[in-house]
Design a protein with these regions (language model features):
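N-terminal alpha-helical scaffolding segments that mark the starts
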Residues: 4-23
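Ankyrin-repeat and related helical/solenoid repeat scaffolds used for protein-protein interactions
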Residues: 333, 338-385, 417-455
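Alpha-helical solenoid repeat architecture
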Residues: 17-30, 44-47, 58-71, 89-90, ...
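Intrinsic disorder/low-complexity segments
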Residues: 5-8, 44, 76, 102, ...
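Short, hydrophobic/charged alpha-helical patches characteristic of ARM/HEAT alpha-solenoid repeats
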Residues: 7, 14, 32-39, 56, ...
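Universal eukaryotic N-terminal targeting presequences
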Residues: 1-2, 316
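HEAT/HEAT-like alpha-solenoid repeats
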Residues: 2-10, 43-50, 54, 85-92, ...
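Intrinsic low-complexity tandem-repeat regions in disordered proteins
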Residues: 64, 75, 106, 117, ...
Length: 455
């Protein structure tokens, strides 16, 4: 073939390469997106996905992924231009570089909303993505697992579709692979599946995920520990049986070490996992306490600030709620002080409310429990929060309930006395009723009461 004939074809190929690589480069910068969209870039990139030059196909897919990643409007444009079926078809036909780029587009579309994720599912992408989990190349597995995670995260129907496509068993295998990034992404995907319903969490358990996840609690990588603790908490939260599966994987006492981790999110996710187990049954709460979990949680709350404290605060409340011995274990572990600190010093009302609730759970069991709270000046602090005009309704309700729980058990007269002067009528009712119970049994308090004219 003569040079004169080949020249225009070579020039055309070079122009396509230059165009698609430049567009992919421009699509990395948000300030270019609107101009690219106005120039009709989607329609120009679409035929290049079927180009006979592999590098052009890959660059076209990469550019589309970057555009779709930018906004749901552009992701919608990918769907409306019927680009998804082409990508899905090519996923099973092309090389590993194209598969990564195609999975990136699917992920970039699916991440925005359930509607767009559903469009990805309807395009037949799930089977193709699941097949990619069996590829030899770890980076292809990573891209596919991330796309599946972005689909599953939205709702239980989409997560169920991922399960039905056979993804879970392969994701569990990916967790066992040596590549760190693949472990992280696979643990995240399993978490996104398990979080929705008991049945989906059971599907993850049935594929043997828990022992492999539990073994990674002690891994040195902080990001992996974050995702592992999160996944275990998403499994444990649903039922007693699922929580027991997590516990039987011998996460205690190893997960308590995560409460001291240098990474804030590892600490919070570990605390959340412990909370989800603690809330289930008395037996599980006792197991946590006997493993040193109460003391470790107290330390965690003491060393944390803001929303990171919440799972620890709730854990102490759940443990204390079950019975008097568990509540006493929280007291002995010096749990009152950090809960009181959260009640007084946290700026967010939902944290104060959680602390109030937990203090109420500690104090409701017996006069001895209530006395520990009274000696720490908790009742007057709860009253102050309750009477604060800026307090939310939920905070007022929980403070009032906690006060009632503590007052009705309190026989420590010095703690009740200030409440007589400060409490509004609806709280004063509980205080007076408690005095009526206490004074006949306490001669010294009765004498003081009479001599002072009623305090």
């Amino acid at each position: 073939m003569s040079r004169a004939v080949l020249a225009p074809f070579e020039a055309y190929q070079k122009a396509r390469v230059t165009f698609v690589q430049t567009v992919a480069e421009l699509a990395q910068r948000p300030q270019n997106i609107e101009a690219l969209q106005s120039a009709g870039v989607m329609a120009l990139l679409r035929p290049l996905l079927l180009d006979n030059v592999p590098s052009i196909q890959q660059s076209a897919a990469l550019a589309l992924g970057r555009l779709a990643n930018y906004s749901d409007e552009l992701a919608e444009a990918v769907v409306s231009n019927e680009i998804l079926p082409q990508l899905v078809y090519s996923l099973s036909e092309q090389n590993r570089f194209y598969k990564k780029a195609a999975a990136y587009v699917l992920r970039s579309v699916a991440k925005h909303s359930p509607h767009l994720a559903k469009a990805v599912v309807n395009s037949g992408a799930l089977d193709a993505l699941v097949n990619c989990l069996e590829e030899f190349d770890p980076s292809v597995k990573e891209a596919a697992a991330l796309a599946l995670s972005c689909i599953a995260k939205h709702n239980h129907e989409l997560a169920q579709a991922v399960v039905d496509a056979g993804a879970v068993g392969l994701l569990v295998l990916c967790v066992q692979e040596p590549e760190l990034t693949l472990k992280r992404i696979s643990a995240t995907a399993l978490s996104e599946i398990a979080k929705h319903t008991e049945e989906l969490a059971q599907a993850v358990v049935d594929q043997g995920a828990v022992p492999y996840l539990a073994a990674l609690i002690s891994h040195p990588d902080a990001q992996l520990k974050r995702y592992v603790c999160q996944c275990l908490s998403q499994i444990a939260k649903h039922t007693v049986d699922l929580a027991e599966v997590v516990v039987e994987a011998e996460i205690f006492p190893r997960i308590l070490n995560c409460l001291k981790d240098i990474d804030v999110q590892v600490r919070k996710n570990a605390a959340t996992c412990i909370r989800e187990i603690a809330k289930q049954t008395t037996e599980l709460a006792k197991l946590i306490v006997h493993s040193g979990g109460a003391a470790a949680t107290v330390d965690y709350i003491s060393e944390s600030k803001g929303n990171a404290r919440l799972p620890g605060i709730m854990t102490l409340g759940y443990i204390s709620a079950f019975d008097d011995s568990l509540a006493m274990a929280v007291i002995v572990s010096k749990g009152i002080a950090p809960l009181k600190d959260a009640l007084m010093n946290e700026p967010e009302d939902h944290l104060k409310a959680a602390a109030a609730w937990s203090l109420g759970q500690i104090g409701r069991h017996s006069p001895e429990h209530a006395k520990y709270l009274a000696e720490a000046d908790v009742p007057s602090r709860l009253l102050a929060v309750y009477m604060l005009q800026e307090s939310s309704k939920d905070l007022k309700d929980k403070s009032k309930k906690a006060l009632k729980n503590i007052i009705q058990m309190c026989t420590h007269v010095p703690a009740l006395e200030p409440l007589l002067q400060l409490a509004p009528n609806n709280i004063l009712t509980y205080v007076c009723a408690q005095f009526a119970k206490v004074l006949p049994q306490n001669l010294e308090a009765k004498r003081t009461f009479v001599q002072s004219g009623g305090f």
